[in-house]
Amino acid sequence: MGQSVVVLGAQWGDEGKGKIVDLLTEEIGAVVRFQGGHNAGHTLVINGKKTVLHLIPSGILRDDALCLIGNGVVISPAALIKEISELEDAGVEVRSRLKISPAAPLIMPYHIALDQAREKAAGGKAIGTTGRGIGPAYEDKVARRGIRIADLHYPPQLEELLRTALDYHNFVLTKYLGVEAVDFQKTYDEALAFGEYVQPMKSDVAGILHDLRKQGKRVLFEGAQGALLDIDHGTYPYVTSSNTTVGGALAGTGVGADAIDYVLGIAKAYATRVGGGPFPTELDDEVGQGIRDRGAEYGASTGRPRRCGWMDIVALKRAVAINGISGLCITKLDVLDGMEKLKICIAYEYHGKRTEYAPLDAQGWEECTPVYLEFPGWSENTHGITVWDDLPPAARAYLRALEELAGCPISIVSTGPDRDHTMVLQDPFA
């Protein structure tokens, strides 16, 4: 049987998953996206050249890798076409290697209109979505009024589905949110055109994955966002609209639990978060700004500045537990270079008591005060180091502390944005 590895974020997203996925795909049969949409922004830097992917799996830059988009992903036709075009203009062959589940839901124009109008109406209480229609598309999926890739090839059925959806959503848009209605004919024509475009890429993703496993091929499941943004297990309601945890890899592709051999959790050497929601270790001072500047902590999809803070072991241990993480990858270690002191949150003060467990609701998280352990920093440059013993002693001690406190071994350490700026201590596929 082949080996299957799930790569997912162990924090609030933006952990550097794209680079690690690309690193692990040197001898891969397939890379599959299983949740989220084009709100993800996976940045790859190879030989100094930067590529940002939003929908297409990060394995696309490997010539022999098959790239799959599972049923758990919501697809923006415009975003997919744009991304394919940009890659092909750069000389990357995409369409012959990209396979998309016919069960994948579409992000329609009314989803985008709803998302943006709701965020505007919410004002200061906004969740902080990317405004790209992700949440409303998932809502329609659950409400069984979503339009999927498969529906595009049956025009009468598509027309009926679209009229039903627009009757519902245009009422909300015009009567409740006070914005313009979405035009039926324009939306219908665009959907039909996309159906023709995507037809050659439509495939039974679950069937492909089962066949690859029988053939002994390696498969990598590429998560988007992070475990603490999971719709069920995250800081609800400040979460994304899909299951970003390991269960999403199963439901979002059509494989069983026995198909997963290793779960790799990606975490920065510190912590970041975009948008609203609790963040106990946030540094709203010059230290946080320094981390933001050195780490270039601005969203790949939105350009929004990320909130920065110290590593939160309480949150990380929760991610390890709910995902059954086999090993951790710590990224952006080099961002901490030159800092005199470092802190790791090892517990919370919550209602006058110390706890090592995260609350199950956002309000509870907001009421937590971090309890820190302090560690000496290092003045040496770790950028690009690929050998463990070449790291400064203080950096090694910091990583060993993370490993011990999280109760999970560190498999990979990243010391820069390039594919080669990485040390693999334990190969997830070995």
UniProtKB/Swiss-Prot annotation:
Binding site for IMP: D14, E15, G16, K17, N39, A40, G41, H42, T130, R144, Q225, T240, R304
Bound cofactor: record note: Binds 1 Mg(2+) ion per subunit.
Enzyme nomenclature, EC number: 6.3.4.4
Binding positions (GTP): 13-19, 41-43, 306, 332-334, 414-416
Disulphide bridges: none
GO biological-process terms attached to the record: 'de novo' AMP biosynthetic process; IMP metabolic process
GO terms for MF: adenylosuccinate synthase activity; GTP binding; magnesium ion binding
One GO CC term on file: cytoplasm
SMART domains per UniProt: Adenylsucc_synt
Pathway: Purine metabolism; AMP biosynthesis via de novo pathway; AMP from IMP: step 1/2
Active site: D14 (proton acceptor), H42 (proton donor)
Catalytic activity: IMP + L-aspartate + GTP = N(6)-(1,2-dicarboxyethyl)-AMP + GDP + phosphate + 2 H(+)
Cofactor(s) listed: Mg(2+)
Positions with a binding annotation for Mg(2+): D14, G41
Assigned protein family: Belongs to the adenylosuccinate synthetase family.
PANTHER family linked to this entry: ADENYLOSUCCINATE SYNTHETASE
Quaternary structure (record): Homodimer.
Protein name: Adenylosuccinate synthetase
Species of the source: Xanthomonas euvesicatoria pv. vesicatoria (strain 85-10)
Lineage of the species this protein comes from: Bacteria, Pseudomonadati, Pseudomonadota, Gammaproteobacteria, Lysobacterales
